[in-house]
Amino acid sequence: MEENEVESSSDAAPGPGRPEEPSESGLGVGTSEAVSADSSDAAAAPGQAEADDSGVGQSSDRGSRSQEEVSESSSSADPLPNSYLPDSSSVSHGPVAGVTGGPPALVHSSALPDPNMLVSDCTASSSDLGSAIDKIIESTIGPDLIQNCITVTSAEDGGAETTRYLILQGPDDGAPMTSPMSSSTLAHSLAAIEALADGPTSTSTCLEAQGGPSSPVQLPPASGAEEPDLQSLEAMMEVVVVQQFKCKMCQYRSSTKATLLRHMRERHFRPVAAAAAAAGKKGRLRKWSTSTKSQEEEGPEEEDDDDIVDAGAIDDLEEDSDYNPAEDEPRGRQLRLQRPTPSTPRPRRRPGRPRKLPRLEISDLPDGVEGEPLVSSQSGQSPPEPQDPEAPSSSGPGHLVAMGKVSRTPVEAGVSQSDAENAAPSCPDEHDTLPRRRGRPSRRFLGKKYRKYYYKSPKPLLRPFLCRICGSRFLSHEDLRFHVNSHEAGDPQLFKCLQCSYRSRRWSSLKEHMFNHVGSKPYKCDECSYTSVYRKDVIRHAAVHSRDRKKRPDPTPKLSSFPCPVCGRVYPMQKRLTQHMKTHSTEKPHMCDKCGKSFKKRYTFKMHLLTHIQAVANRRFKCEFCEFVCEDKKALLNHQLSHVSDKPFKCSFCPYRTFREDFLLSHVAVKHTGAKPFACEYCHFSTRHKKNLRLHVRCRHASSFEEWGRRHPEEPPSRRRPFFSLQQIEELKQQHSAAPGPPPSSPGPPEIPPEATTFQSSEAPSLLCSDTLGGATIIYQQGAEESTAMATQTALDLLLNMSAQRELGGTALQVAVVKSEDVEAGLASPGGQPSPEGATPQVVTLHVAEPGGGAAAESQLGPPDLPQITLAPGPFGGTGYSVITAPPMEEGTSAPGTPYSEEPAGEAAQAVVVSDTLKEAGTHYIMATDGTQLHHIELTADGSISFPSPDALASGAKWPLLQCGGLPRDGPEPPSPAKTHCVGDSQSSASSPPATSKALGLAVPPSPPSAATAASKKFSCKICAEAFPGRAEMESHKRAHAGPGAFKCPDCPFSARQWPEVRAHMAQHSSLRPHQCSQCSFASKNKKDLRRHMLTHTKEKPFACHLCGQRFNRNGHLKFHIQRLHSPDGRKSGTPTARAPTQTPTQTIILNSDDETLATLHTALQSSHGVLGPERLQQALSQEHIIVAQEQTVTNQEEAAYIQEITTADGQTVQHLVTSDNQVQYIISQDGVQHLLPQEYVVVPEGHHIQVQEGQITHIQYEQGAPFLQESQIQYVPVSPGQQLVTQAQLEAAAHSAVTAVADAAMAQAQGLFGTDETVPEHIQQLQHQGIEYDVITLADD
């Protein structure tokens, strides 16, 4: 369908020399919009129009002010100051109804470019207004076009009438219907309508066709319009009715009349002050509104600087203004989304710099009428002159092309370029609120109008002076003035120096720079020359001079080598050094609960635990505590370790666990209940934490804190892993430098440092030495009061633990106790005269027999046999010695009174007592017998020893050794090496190695190593004398011994004469586990592991901690728990940190329920009351069990604790745990026998003896010629009721334990010293008839 164009009469004759300018009545033929620019961006109304459902009604008042334009197509020469023509936006959208109730009315007339029907309705309040509108429409449309229109007039409420003109399509093929337009006639018509401005509002209805939006055209008035024939035109009628109301004074449109009237009252008929106030409430500044009436009365040509909207944008000749009119659009209110209209989108303006805002000018208006300012195209130009009548109209098709090129052609004066107005209505994103920029708000919000929206603090401002450029605040007006003057060109981010050319983008930098011109900075440190611009810098700097400030330590340089502080070995990593340091420690915190082995390193311990995990089926492993099953051993091990917890206190509300009860109480109070369980006893203070209560009592109740602290002792901090303090490292250094171990090839006695031979007189240690001839071991005890108790404990230790047996090489341990009083006196006094009785400390000599073995056979002492030594106490007087020995036996004969024999041997032993009658002046004798004669060792006054004759040596006599170890209390001195000698050949067996001296604090004289011991290794077999570098291989070797020259596999009948063959065969049985658990799939190589495993099924935990109540299934675990969690320093009690010779700690254990008796005996043995009175001793012996044991230091760090399983003669199996911390043997289990805590000792049957490796029982060895037994048997021989060594009640209580009988016998023998001496031999004879060699300690009173 072709479009109809309405052309004016001036289109054909354009003015000479004038370019064709677009008119606001031009039609957009072939384009989507008629006019592409208007003044809507400067005339944005605060209120938003409401569109109807058709989507056409919308508000176009989106600018900052409304602008009215003067038509350039008018042919009149006179300006029309009171005439307001519609702008392009109204023309492009259709007919507009004029509002006559306000200021001068704007008459809107239009014609459609396309042959569609247009329906225009006008409602007037009077017939005059309606007739005027009819005349204007008739003159605008033209006489030729009005013939094809239908006029429909209808009455409305209030007497208003609506006249509708139906423009019909022509009968031809869409030929354009044109009529000449006279602008002068239109002007006269508008002037006539102005006289009716007081009438009611008239509206118009625009009927738009489907082909596109209609564009109004101003046409000259015409007279004599006639109504067309309706019947002939009905077939060509197509009507689309859209009712719309438009304001004549601005571009506001509305679909309802009420909204338009409200808009006109608020925007056009309110006083200026009220309008400004309303605009201020909406948060926007209307720059175009006039403020005074004097400005309204000025002429339109008069220019005033106060009316300039943006002086920077207008006067900026370099065109570098950053002003953008689009930024002013959303100031007052948020833009609403416009609904899409059926019109095609208007052409978009090309992106580019926005044009400058034109200057506003006030035109002369009649009194009482508010006028809108006219807009000029340039700020310096005068209002536009009326155009020539012959000026070209904008309705021509040639001008339509120019209108499409808005950005290239000059735009009509008074038309602003608005992106928001030219945007397509169907694009809602164009009207969204602009995102707020971060940082300081825009300068447009810094005006007075927006101050009421600022946050005002109720407190007075510390810096009341505000810079409006950058928003900074200052204390004084002078600082503000200096700051404002420093802003370069008003830029908030650029500062300049007022005295030089310095520029900076930071105010602080400029402030610091300005002090270069002043000469000094205002703030200075009081203690040094430091100055600064800011006081806070000086305050921060002053902390350097504060004494209370903790100085940061200098960063330690990264080390590439980590030397060991003890031995000097260097490691490349700290982790390796930490692991190495554990080798110097005696602590083995990790103990296996299945086999009893302990380890220093957790990694080694975990690797060992993997050996106890057995597969269930198909290489799947099951947890022993729950139903967890996995395929990885290590994963299962980590899972099982999670079941073992050292935190017995568990929260009842959550899974929290801890090892201290006060921690649990604090946790429950803080996390769950909110209570304060720890209350002060002296006031009302209470707290949730125990440490706060202690702090409160110490600060607030200082006088009562000491008493309160005794009732509430502070628990020591727990240490969960080995820790090496500086003190411990220094002790380890001294041990390493003082007692270095000998090389493996020569295990002879090391050099004894001076501190090894010194001992304190107040705490007299037991000194042990060995005689190479007779294997004699001498114990020296100084101090008259302590001699009895210390001698008793040392003798029992040697008898029961046999800690020195391995070093002496003996298999039969016999103890002889000799007591003398005047030995020290003879050595100390000149001429050998005895000293006074009170100045001589007691000397106790312990004689150990030399066993028959390889070492004894090499010496020239006679045949290798086991000498018979029988204990025979003699009736000692006040002074004298008792030397007990036996004559040498013939080769091949056995001793009738062997310690392991059950035959009575009372008559075979001979006792020789050297009394005062045998002493000579200045000489003391120790006599021994070879069966026919006595030999003696003479001790001279200077301490030298007179050796016996060579005949005595050739006779093979066993010569005991006497060493003076007692010194006066006030002057302790180390004994001279000249006072300690070994009688016999220098190639005899070696003396006590460092293990014994370390464990018991021995003074060992240095001697050169012999050839026989030089080739020996650390561990050797006593049957075949084969040496081994490790204990494990030696134990395997001993188990395979089937005789002196044969070996047999312990798991099968295989046998061989060479150990390597059996060792290679035994490797095939290494994976065999014959002992199967009856409740699960566990299997072990031996019975002891199986018995330990069974405890996991019974869940038996017999050992309980008395401090926290946690229970354990191993006593060693309990001790480790107490040491780790409850020990103050994290060490094992009784285990000294240093290995230097110190006093051997003692322990007294009484098993009874009477606390008084326990305290009595404990005090007697450990508080320097060595000699017990008859009353106290009788009170102690009346209890059930008295077991005296000695805890020793660890002799070898690498030895781990182990479990030994022993089968008794009656078929019972006893398991013993030998720990490495104190070398004490514990009973693990014994069938049918109640456990006796904490120690149990055994007596071996005939033909066997116990080998001791560094204080640990390693194996049971057969004597030469004795029958070999497949399984070792150890027999417990109880004391018979007929023996009267102790009371009947004590014998019944000690029936299960031989060691209890030994201990009781020793104590009873000590008690017998206060009785008759005639009963003592009878008791010894009774013991000998029983076949048990009980070693009796003879104690003599002063």
UniProtKB/Swiss-Prot annotation:
Recorded hits in PROSITE patterns, A to Z, give: ZINC_FINGER_C2H2_1, ZINC_FINGER_C2H2_2
Provide the assembly information: Interacts with NCOA6; may enhance ligand-dependent transcriptional activation by nuclear hormone receptors. Interacts with CNOT6. Interacts with CNOT9; the interaction is direct. Component of a nuclear receptor-mediated transcription complex composed of at least ZNF335, CCAR2 and EMSY; the complex stimulates the transcription of nuclear receptor target genes such as SOX9 and HOXA1. Within the complex interacts with EMSY and interacts (via C-terminus) with CCAR2. Interacts with members of histone H3'Lys4'(H3K4) methyltransferase complexes ASH2L, CXXC1, KMT2A/MLL1, RBBP5, SETD1A and WDR5.
Q: Identify the gene encoding this protein.
A: ZNF335
Instruction: Specify the protein name.
Output: Zinc finger protein 335
Q: Where do Polar residues bias regions lie? A: 201-217
Q: Where found, per UniProt?
A: Nucleus
Bias-annotated ranges (Low complexity): 34-49, 986-997
Mention one GO molecular function. RNA polymerase II cis-regulatory region sequence-specific DNA binding
Organism source for this protein? Homo sapiens
